Design a protein with these regions (language model features):
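Terminal "cap-and-tail" regions of soluble proteins that handle hydrophobic small molecules
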Residues: 151-193
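Regular secondary-structure segments
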Residues: 28-36, 180-183, 187
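Short solvent-exposed beta->alpha transition segments
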Residues: 19-20, 25-30, 37-105
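C-terminal or late-domain output modules
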Residues: 49, 123, 136-141, 160-171
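Hydrophobic helical h-region of N-terminal Sec-dependent signal peptides
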Residues: 4-12
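C-terminal region of N-terminal signal peptides and the immediate post-cleavage residues
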Residues: 13-18
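Short beta-strand edge/turn micro-motifs at domain boundaries
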Residues: 109-113, 117-153, 157, 190
């Protein structure tokens, strides 16, 4: 083995991603990454004893994130860099907020406080950190609103993607405005999940 290949092997061995359950922060990050890429199964694997309500909430968030990501993919394929709808940028900001969020650890329990978001509660289960009930972070009204929003988001994303493919939407600005209008948004930076 040459010195270069040995150094490369050492680098690769030491630069592997952290075990998702190794710390509260790495667990919360792995959970959010899974949700944002639309992978409800991987996200649910990081939830402590998921209830039916947890499964619904995680699947809803993952489906919404996936629909919006696919819409942005269609917009960027049609309009190039101008087709950026702010969705990927919002996802990056959400992940970055976890990296800097204050963390409280008390024994086998932890709470991460991301700026501008609800606290993420975690607990250690058999030596691994897991996200506590995502559904409990929502009130009953918020759960009902999530269900409505999911349906609206998926329908709006599919409809707008179809319009972009059919060239009925003429510009990236028109696509962003149509998405904001469909989702009832007036903000300039991205769209919420």
């Amino acid at each position: 083995m040459t010195a270069l290949s040995w150094m490369l092997a050492v680098f690769l061995a030491t630069s592997s991603p952290p075990d998702p359950g190794a710390s509260p922060r790495s667990t919360a990050r792995a959970y959010l990454e899974a949700v944002l890429r639309g992978d409800a199964g991987s996200a649910l694997a990081l939830v402590a004893d998921p209830s039916d309500a947890d499964r619904f909430v995680v699947r809803a968030h993952a489906a919404s994130a996936d629909a919006l990501r696919r819409l942005e993919d269609v917009a960027t394929s049609r309009f190039g860099a101008r087709g950026d709808l702010g969705i990927a940028a919002r996802h990056r900001r959400l992940l970055a907020s976890l990296d800097h969020a204050p963390l409280e650890v008390s024994g086998d329990r932890a709470v991460l406080h991301p700026e501008g978001g609800k606290p993420i509660r975690l607990r250690r289960v058999l030596g691994k950190w897991k996200v506590e009930s995502p559904a409990e972070r929502l009130t009953g009204e918020e759960q009902r609103a999530l269900e409505r929003t999911l349906k609206e988001t998926e329908a709006a994303a599919q409809d707008l993607a179809g319009q972009i493919r059919a060239r009925a939407v003429k510009s990236a600005e028109e696509a962003r405005e149509a998405l904001r209008k469909a989702l009832g948004q007036v903000q300039q930076e991205g769209v919420p999940l």
